[in-house]
Amino acid sequence: MRSKAIAALGILSLFASIVPAFGQTKIGVITSLTGSLAAFGEAHKNGYAIALDEINAKGGVLGKKIELDFYDDQSKPDQAVQGVSKLIDQDQVPVLLGSYSSESTKAIVPAVSQRETPLIIPTATADNVMDSKSPWIFRVCAGANDYAKETIAFLKANGAPRKMAIVYENTNFGQSNMKAMTAAAKEAGIELVAVESYEAKSPDYKAVLQRVKQANPDVIYFCSYLLDATTLMRQSREVDLNPKYYTSSGTGFAAAEFPTEKGAGKNAEYTFSVSQWLPEAKWAGSKEFDAEYFKRFKSHPAYHAIQAYAALRVAAQAINNAKSLDPAKIRDAIKNINMSSTPFGPIKFDNGQNQHPVLITQVQKGQYRVVFPADAAETKPIIPAPVWSKR
């Protein structure tokens, strides 16, 4: 009798592990809701909310509504790893979305792969988050190499500067973008006259910026999150640093708050950034997403929000295509997914990487405007950036 009871309990346990709570299907989300990256985590949460309502309004997945199971990584990689254990081991989610930063995402890749659960990455651009070649890992956003190559293509088409400085935070995110741009600049024949790292969230970068000023670059390429992007531009003005081009690997320089008084304000003018989306992008539903976001949250979204939206759309489509909550079947469905039209553009994965185009934007009169490539441009770039004394 005891063996039969144990067997019965085992079957019930297995059944509970693959069947969600009645009437709903849980999808796990790790993002940064507190800590230094909370502004980006909030953008994630907002993007997920719009996708969630759209999907559930159309019947959810497999006839059941989706519920998002959030875990706050507190902007810390070790907390993100704990989130994997909580969401997969305890909550038994069949697919995971996250995290925000490259640091936290790189930390969770081995843990998710070991648990044989699909991970859909919305925003982490460091290319080494994909180094494992794990069949369980998929990235919606473009990576650091794509950012560097498109920035170089833009520079070649707009004045072809010969000297560059790279200023990057000393983290996985910053190092990955620095290495990508170093290689791209070398290939393009652009001289690197300064490569300066800094510790994130410091109050004073003037010593770094003074060294860059002495090197006299035509263009600066920043790799920074929002707080540092704001400080770097304010202190660039204070030390009277005047390159012809202020460029960046996005992130802080592409945040919705950056050109506002919550960020760099007027100091953001004329800065260039890579971007993966703007409302003006020529993708079906792009402007409608922007309008819905503004209606709900009283601000216009940066691309981080729509990347989260896209990640959840992929997860839902994959579950429906798989006709199952089995993680392996969902993984195979993601591999074969071909979403030809979304507000984030077409989505199709090649070895886990979505082939997403990169845009170059410039802050003009407090707004991000697409200036490159030519077939997507709204307006012409303003080059050179006016010197600070003439602004």
Protein language model regions, located:
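Extracytosolic ligand-binding ectodomains
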Residues: S3-F15, F22-R391
